[in-house]
Amino acid sequence: MKDIVAKEATAIQSIKVTDAFVEAVNLLLNCRGKVITTGMGKAGYIAHKFAATMSSTGTSAFFVHPAEAGHGDLGMLSKDDCIVAFSTSGKSNEVLEMLGNASRNLGVNTVIGVTSHIDSPLRDMSKIVLDMGPDIEEPCPINTTPSATIAVMLAISDALALTLMELKDFTTSDYHARHHKGYLGSVTRPDTGYDES
């Protein structure tokens, strides 16, 4: 187990924070429309979590499932939106089809791609590419189950969300306004005497 954790930690530590990361933050900070996240499979779970983290920290965002996009959910997008697409291979047909249709049919052309493979078609469809690194070693015994790659995606998405949070001077009271339930709601609650739990 220690070896698995070590390999995932190594993958995260190998992320190269380049100028593309700064460009991505600025693009999201100045997005005139909505921030949309998407991804398929395990990458989709990271995209969904990214939207949830952004929404609770001052950047309104939501997840669109790429398969459902072809069945009407593409209509949730509009021209000024910014899409953040997650795919290690950059070859997931559902993601590529969604991005192609969003561009052709709705004029949505602002895409940040989070991907690893050098020959990833997602790179060509993205205005900004956040490179996960080309040689991420999966600790899986048969080298197939995505875990280190997913850990890298999670780290990249958290870095974006928390940097945006800082740039927006997001406060504890701002957080509580969006997240008033549970433990985090209780520790960020102003001393009003009103119990929102």
Model-inferred region functions:
Residues 34-164:
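Glycine-rich phosphate-binding loops that contact phosphosugars or nucleotide phosphates
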